[in-house]
Amino acid sequence: MEIHMTSIQELVINFHMTEACNYRCGYCYATWQDNSSDTELHHASENIHSLLLKLADYFFADNSLRQTLKYQSVRINFAGGEPVMLGSRFIDAILFAKQLGFATSIITNGHLLSTVMLKKIAVHLDMLGISFDTGDYLIAQSIGRVDRKKSWLSPARVLDVVTQYRALNPKGKVKINTVVNAYNWRENLTQTITQLKPDKWKLLRVLPVYSKEMTVLQWQYESYVHKHQVHADVIVVEDNDDMWQSYLMINPEGRFYQNAGACKGLTYSPPVLEVGVEEALKYINFNAEAFSKRYQSIHLPLAMSAGA
C-alpha cells in the first residue's frame, strides 16, 4: 500500500530537557556530543521560557512546515534523559508550555513519578508516556533499566502510576513505549498491556545511532510484534527506517538535532536562542513526508503500520 503525505492534526516537537537519568539503558541514544550539564537550559527558567516562546512564535504562525503538513496544533513532548529528575523546573516548563497554547506530553521511565508530582502535573498533561521494556527484573538489569540501588519499575508500579494519572485527568491519554532489543525480544507483555489499557503502545526497534549493541534482527523484531497481535488496535510499529529524520528533536542546550545515520551519531543546529527557529531548522535534515507517514500509519493494519 502506497502512503502519500497528507495533512496531520498535530505537530510534535520532542524537547529533551536533560541528559541526566537514573537509569543506564545500554541502547540509549539520548546523549549529545559536548553536552555539559552546566549548559542545559533548565538551569534558568527564563531560558526555557524563551525557547518555548520562540517555538510558539514560529510553529503557531504560518511557515513552510505548516504549509506542507497543514497541522492544526503543536505538542511539546518533554523527554530526557529523565525529565522528572528536574523537579520544579520540569513542572514549570509544562505549565508554561500549556499557558502558551501547546498540547503537552512527557516520556518518562516512571521511576520517580510520585503521587505528589502527578497531582501537580496530571491536569496539565495531555498525554503520559511511559518507557517500559520488560516485566522481568533480570531482563531490566541486563538492559540497564534499574537505578543505582538496583530498583526498577515493575508492572505493578506502572499500573499504579497509570491508574493515578487517569484518576487525576480522565481525559488524558496514556502511551507505552517499548524498545525491542536483544534482551527482551522473546518476552510476552500481553498480560501487562491488557491491564494498562494504553491508548497507544509504540514498539520501537532499537536504533543503532552510536553502535549496534543490543540490536535485533528483522525476524526477531517482527516476532515480538506478531506475538502481541491481540493488542493490534493500539500497537504502533516503528522500525529503524521509520525513525530516521522523522522526528523534530531539541537537545538540552536548545539545539535541533537529527540522527545522521546508522552508527554515525547526530547532527546539530546552532542554539535556537541565538539564531531563531527558522535558521536553526536549516541545519538539520527533517523529512516531513516521513513524519507524516508515521502519523498516517496509526490506523493501518498492524502488518503494514509504522510508528507514531
UniProtKB/Swiss-Prot annotation:
Residues 7-253 form the Radical SAM core domain. Belongs to the radical SAM superfamily. Viperin family. The keyword Lyase applies. Keywords: 4Fe-4S, Antiviral defense, Iron, Iron-sulfur, Lyase, Metal-binding, S-adenosyl-L-methionine. It comes from the Bacteria. It catalyses: CTP + AH2 + S-adenosyl-L-methionine = 3'-deoxy-3',4'-didehydro-CTP + 5'-deoxyadenosine + L-methionine + A + H2O + H(+); GTP + AH2 + S-adenosyl-L-methionine = 3'-deoxy-3',4'-didehydro-GTP + 5'-deoxyadenosine + L-methionine + A + H2O + H(+); UTP + AH2 + S-adenosyl-L-methionine = 3'-deoxy-3',4'-didehydro-UTP + 5'-deoxyadenosine + L-methionine + A + H2O + H(+). The keyword Iron applies. Its EC number is 4.2.-.-. One of its GO terms (molecular function) is metal ion binding. One of its GO terms (biological process) is defense response to virus. Expression of pVip58 in E.coli (strain MG1655) confers resistance to phages lambda, P1 and T7; delays culture collapse upon infection with T7. Catalyzes the conversion of cytidine triphosphate (CTP) to 3'-deoxy-3',4'-didehydro-CTP (ddhCTP), guanosine triphosphate (GTP) to 3'-deoxy-3',4'-didehydro-GTP (ddhGTP) and uridine triphosphate (UTP) to 3'-deoxy-3',4'-didehydro-UTP (ddhUTP), probably via a SAM-dependent radical mechanism. NCBIfam families: viperin_w_prok (NF038283). This is S-adenosylmethionine-dependent nucleotide dehydratase. [4Fe-4S] cluster binds at C21, C25, C28. How this protein allows bacteria to resist viruses that do not encode their own RNA polymerase (such as lambda, P1) is unknown. Its cofactor is [4Fe-4S] cluster.
